[in-house]
A protein has these predicted regions:
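Conserved phosphate-chemistry cores used by DNA topoisomerases
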Residues: 1-632
Length: 632
């Protein structure tokens, strides 16, 4: 208490203990009494206001503790002043950690890392008792305000509070993960839509195979194709869509993912456990895992995300031979009378087509979705069992998977896509494929397509879905107004659009918007409420109530004479939109755009069409443009 008097009284006051002078230290030096010198314990100190001094360090007790004074009174139980400073530190630290580390930390986790020092002067303070251990004066009556600076937070975070909070968060997440762990048992409950194998979880579980399929319709087809004997050995679980990328996700996010939690229960997986081959066969409810997805590019992505989940969370299972694999199903069939030929790649079909009179007399049916197959065809798939198992090749396989899913390796993905070969595909006759072959010959096609549909084409300025809309509008000769919802249906029918019409409606609305900040030249006309700049166009009316048609200027920019010389794409035998249009001015500059693909992203501003045209005229005449082209 003698040292306390020395720090809270005026420096002119001489303080003695048993006749020996006690040095009058300032508040920063006073902190040494509790936590030792700066060389021993790092701390942060600042004076945010002439009436306030604050300091903080890592708590030596692994729980929150504080030392505080109000007008020279030791408030050992804290009070409103401590709560005010602490809440600021905690809130700012949460934002700081999320920005720097992309990790969400709870306030209690930050608080338990801190030891807080506060010395303040409050006007007419009140306390909760006569011992004056806890100050309860409302903040509005303090006569001053303490604002914790960003510099204080930055120093405190780098001092070790951020690392300690993240470590504590991971420990709590690991404990939480244990609650979602699976175990080997004959019956499991609480997993909707899961159809288990009769032998799963029993003495013959090593002979069982779990099939992860894409959607409920795929599950229905697979179940219809299983024989009575197959029901003993095969379990089926439909995925709702694409799994999250678990490589960079924190444990809390993974624990809260219902899909992953269900897979853990079904297989009997334990978080963080390493499995040898013998342990996997003995402790898991299934001895093998197969993926059955649609034979399109998104299906390849789903397979890749599933592989990534096991590679990042249960790496040893990836190494086990014949544990992970997928079942090949035909991408198309050619039928002539009673004869049927199945093809598992487009290249195999094209080769056969060229050698057989261009397929004349054969009926072609595409099977890009598992839901296209009948129960009879699923029985054929399981009779043939064209199963391909993944093969692990050490660091080469690890690097291939990491390159695709590690968010920090965007530059590596750029180099990867720079070597893209559209003819490089997996051999459907192989029963084993390495993980690196899967990424380089199957996943890469999705990544290339992801860039094409997410990033505007440099030539015409359109993403794939918007180009389909423009193609459909030209094909329909859309000079009379039509409801946006009706146009979306027409686009789906005539351009091979395979995704939800909600995004298609949004694309049509976006192409027609003309408020400031949207399009400099809108390809479609907004006949109705298509949104305002107040909400960035998100406040448009329902697609059922608004109309649109081609803007008269659109056909001038994309001349009809060019239509016959464009290279048109093919989708399931249907002629669809061209690879790109050839506008007479660079629309990528006129309307700008943005998008994030695989490895690449783009964000471009809008520019004045008149200036762009003047610049082009100068270029055509061999002159230099003297104007200054600015965003417009």
């Amino acid at each position: 208490r003698t040292y306390d008097i020395g720090v809270v009284t005026d420096k002119s006051v001489k303080v003695k203990f048993n006749g020996k002078a006690v040095p009058n230290k300032n508040f920063e030096q006073y902190m040494d009494i509790y936590i030792g010198p700066k060389t021993e314990t790092k701390r942060v100190y600042e004076i945010p206001h002439e009436r306030w001094e604050i300091g903080a360090c890592l708590s030596p007790l692994d729980e929150f503790t504080q030392v505080s004074y109000v007008n020279g009174i030791n408030t050992c139980k804290g009070g409103k002043h401590i709560d005010f400073v602490l809440n600021q530190i905690v809130k700012k630290m949460i934002v700081y950690i999320e920005k720097k580390k992309k990790v969400k930390v709870k306030p209690a986790t930050i608080k338990e890392q801190l030891m807080l020092f506060v010395n303040c002067v409050i006007e007419n303070p009140s306390f909760d008792s006569q011992t004056k251990e806890c100050m309860n004066t409302p903040q509005s009556r303090w006569g001053s305000k303490c604002e914790v600076s960003d510099k204080f937070i930055d120093k405190l975070a780098k001092m070790g509070v951020m690392e300690s909070a993240i470590a504590s968060n991971e420990i709590k997440a690991a404990k939480s993960a244990k609650k979602t762990d699976g175990r080997k048992t004959r019956n499991i409950r609480g997993v909707p839509k899961y159809m288990g194998a009769n032998w799963a979880g029993g003495t013959k579980s090593k002979d069982c195979t779990l099939i992860l399929c894409e959607g409920d319709s795929a599950k229905a087809g697979i179940v219809s194709g299983l024989s009575k004997e197959d029901r003993d050995k095969y379990g089926v679980f439909p995925l709702k869509g694409k799994l999250m990328n678990t490589l960079d996700a924190n444990l809390n996010k993974i624990n809260n993912n219902e899909e992953i939690t269900n897979i853990k229960k079904i297989l009997g997986l334990i978080t963080g456990k390493t499995y040898t081959k013998e342990e996997a066969l003995k402790q898991l409810r299934y001895g093998k895992l197969l993926f059955m997805t649609d034979q399109d590019l998104d299906g390849s992505h789903i397979k890749g995300l599933c592989i990534n989940m096991f590679h990042s969370q249960w790496h040893d299972l990836v190494k086990i031979p014949n544990f992970l694999g997928f079942m090949n199903t035909p991408i198309l069939k050619a039928t002539k009378g009673k004869r049927t030929k199945s093809f598992y790649t487009d290249s195999a079909y094209k080769t056969w087509k060229q050698a057989n009179n261009n397929g004349k007399g054969w009926k072609i049916k595409y099977y890009k979705g598992l839901g296209t197959s009948t129960a009879k065809e699923f029985k054929e798939y399981f009779a043939e069992k064209k199963v391909v198992m993944f093969k692990y090749n050490g660091e080469t396989s690890d690097n291939a998977i990491d390159r695709v899913f590690n968010k920090t390796r965007a530059d590596d993905r750029k180099d990867w896509l720079a070597n893209y070969d559209k003819d490089a595909v997996l051999n459907p006759d192989n029963n084993k494929v390495s993980f690196e072959d899967f990424t380089d010959r199957e996943m890469i096609h999705f990544s290339k397509y992801d860039c094409e549909r997410s990033i505007p084409n440099l030539v015409d300025g359109w993403k794939t879905s918007l180009r389909k809309i423009l193609y459909a509008a030209f094909k329909r000769n859309l000079i009379s107004e039509i409801k946006v919802a009706q146009l979306a249906g027409y686009v789906s029918e005539h351009s091979g659009y395979h995704h939800g019409e909600a995004s298609l409606n949004g694309g049509i609305v976006g192409m027609a918007q003309e408020f400031i900040g949207s399009n400099n030249i809108n390809a479609l006309l907004p006949l109705g409420q298509f949104g305002t700049r107040l909400k960035g166009g998100k406040d448009s009316a329902s697609e059922r109530y608004i109309f649109t048609k081609l803007n008269a200027i659109t056909r001038a920019i994309y001349p009809k004479l060019d239509d016959d010389v464009l290279y048109y794409l093919d989708d399931d035998g249907l002629k669809v939109e061209p690879e790109y249009y050839a506008p007479i001015i660079p629309m990528i500059l006129v309307n700008g755009g943005k998008g994030i693909g695989t490895g690449f992203s783009y964000e471009g501003l809008c520019y004045n069409p008149t200036q762009i045209i003047d610049c082009l005229k100068c270029k055509l005449k061999g002159k230099e443009y003297s104007g200054d082209i600015k965003p417009y």
